[in-house]
């Protein structure tokens, strides 16, 4: 088992480039199943484990998928299988995004119930409600969700009880080949939704209103392959913004799109962090003293839940009491216990956490409880006394490309090692401490 070892105390300086957005590329690759002719070419694709998983799902379904030099080429013109088995879906809940395109294109989809990060229940009832409104029959049993429709799906007016990103994406894809017009009300507004709509429109789709609460999809009879470049990853950008701030560093985050990061920029500036637009990115200058703040996670354009754990790491360094309220997912404070192992003064009260700072964090062995928590623990390690050892890196690899190498390029004392190497390093450090 591998772990990342961080030795705290270095200010980060330099330039880091953001990858293509993980949360945009997965639905875009899934949407390639809609193309009954021509190949799709998707550029700026990050080399993440989740990308390899969704590629395997498409191959299992009968599509030809080639991934090289950050470019995915998909040919889904042949006859497709309609079942996504548990061996793939258990690794990543985004695999459920093949339901919409399969149902629209073939009239049938059978997908195993999803896996991925263990963040609350994350139900997919909004997806299924939308499919039913468009004329599909749904059966759930034996660990699978099966959807069927006679002929084409029918355009419908669908109100989402919650602006679910996954449901919005799945229903856009299903509606793209439906007969008539579908209207999604209370739709998710994330930049990744806009990216998906732009891709489907390039394939010959007719989608209007993406990025607003009301999206209209006029169904077409067929879609073709298209070339598309994925937007930069706003969560990776935000993570490096926090890395610069927490270490009192000075870092240019290339590819960070200010319009995608409005709430994060506002909250970091409220803490006293200097953020400047520079070229095609943002320069982050961390202050010597951070101010405490309160924040609440919300659907976009509110504060993103995927930045909650990183901000918790930053707030442990703030001078005073801060509060974070999580409204998007339940059970997303598991990293708080790991921060406590590092001397964090954190108290959980229902869906909120109270953070008292500043504290001098202490290096410890901690486990990444989910993807973003893994990054947050590494950020905390950047300013902890001694060395911090972060395990369960499979979560981190689902969302970050060469995270430790990028931090090392900014001056962090960080390395990724296996168990044997870790023991050797720790023994050397014990001897060094004894001789000091």
UniProtKB/Swiss-Prot annotation:
Pathway: Cell wall biogenesis; peptidoglycan biosynthesis
Keywords: Cell cycle, Cell division, Cell shape, Cell wall biogenesis/degradation, Cytoplasm, Peptidoglycan synthesis, Pyruvate, Transferase
Catalytic residues, chain numbering: 117
Any one biological process term the GO annotation gives: UDP-N-acetylgalactosamine biosynthetic process
Superkingdom field: Bacteria
GO molecular function: UDP-N-acetylglucosamine 1-carboxyvinyltransferase activity
Ligand binding (UDP-N-acetyl-alpha-D-glucosamine): 93, 122-126, 306, 328
Its EC number(s): 2.5.1.7
Binding site for phosphoenolpyruvate: 22-23
Cell compartment(s), UniProt: Cytoplasm
Annotated coiled-coil segments of the chain: none
Residues carrying 2-(S-cysteinyl)pyruvic acid O-phosphothioketal: 117
Transcription keyword on record: no
Catalytic activity annotation: phosphoenolpyruvate + UDP-N-acetyl-alpha-D-glucosamine = UDP-N-acetyl-3-O-(1-carboxyvinyl)-alpha-D-glucosamine + phosphate
Gene Ontology CC: cytoplasm
First and last residue of the signal peptide: none
Purpose of the protein: Cell wall formation. Adds enolpyruvyl to UDP-N-acetylglucosamine.
The family this protein is said to belong to: Belongs to the EPSP synthase family. MurA subfamily.
Protein name listed in UniProt: UDP-N-acetylglucosamine 1-carboxyvinyltransferase 1
Lineage: Bacteria, Bacillati, Bacillota, Bacilli, Bacillales
Name of encoding gene: murA1
């Amino acid at each position: 088992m591998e772990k990342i070892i961080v030795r705290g105390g270095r200010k980060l300086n330099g330039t880091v480039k953001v990858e293509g957005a993980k949360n945009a590329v997965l639905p875009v690759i899934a949407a390639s199943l809609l193309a009954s002719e021509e190949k799709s070419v998707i550029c700026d694709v990050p080399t993440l484990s989740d990308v390899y998983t969704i590629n395997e799902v498409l191959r299992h379904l009968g599509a030809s998928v080639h991934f090289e030099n950050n470019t995915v080429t998909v040919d889904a013109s042949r006859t497709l299988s309609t079942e996504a088995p548990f061996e793939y879906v258990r690794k990543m809940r985004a695999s459920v995004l093949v339901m919409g395109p399969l149902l629209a294109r073939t009239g049938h989809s059978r997908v195993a119930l999803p896996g991925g990060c263990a963040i609350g229940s994350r139900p997919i009832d909004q997806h299924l409600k939308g499919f039913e409104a468009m004329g599909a029959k749904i059966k759930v049993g034996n660990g699978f969700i099966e959807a069927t429709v006679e002929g084409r799906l029918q355009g419908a007016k669908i109100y989402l009880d919650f602006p679910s990103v996954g449901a919005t994406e799945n229903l856009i894809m299903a509606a793209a080949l439906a007969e008539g017009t579908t209207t999604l009300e209370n739709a998710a507004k994330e930049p990744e939704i806009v990216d998906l709509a732009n891709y489907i429109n390039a394939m010959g789709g007719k989608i209007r209103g993406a990025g607003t609460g009301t999206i209209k999809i006029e169904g077409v009879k067929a879609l073709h392959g298209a070339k598309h470049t994925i937007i930069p990853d706003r969560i990776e950008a935000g993570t490096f913004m926090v890395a610069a701030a927490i270490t009192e560093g000075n870092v240019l985050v290339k590819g960070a799109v200010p319009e995608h990061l409005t709430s994060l920029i506002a909250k970091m500036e409220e803490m006293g962090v200097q953020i400047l637009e520079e070229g095609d990115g943002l320069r982050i200058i961390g202050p010597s003293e951070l101010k405490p703040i309160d924040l609440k996670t919300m659907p976009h354009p509110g504060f993103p839940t995927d930045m909650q754990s990183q901000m918790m790491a930053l707030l442990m360094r703030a001078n005073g009491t801060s509060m974070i309220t999580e409204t998007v997912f339940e059970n997303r404070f598991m990293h708080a216990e790991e921060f406590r192992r590092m001397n964090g003064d954190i108290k959980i009260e229902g869906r909120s956490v109270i953070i008292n700072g500043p504290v001098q964090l202490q290096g410890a062995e901690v486990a990444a409880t989910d993807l973003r928590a893994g990054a947050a623990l590494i950020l905390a390690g950047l300013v902890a006394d001694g060395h911090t050892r972060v395990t369960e890196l499979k979560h981190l690899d689902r969302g970050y490309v060469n995270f430790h190498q990028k931090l090392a390029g900014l001056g962090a004392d960080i390395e990724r090692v296996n168990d044997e190497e870790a023991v050797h390093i720790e023994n050397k450090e014990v001897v060094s401490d004894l001789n000091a």
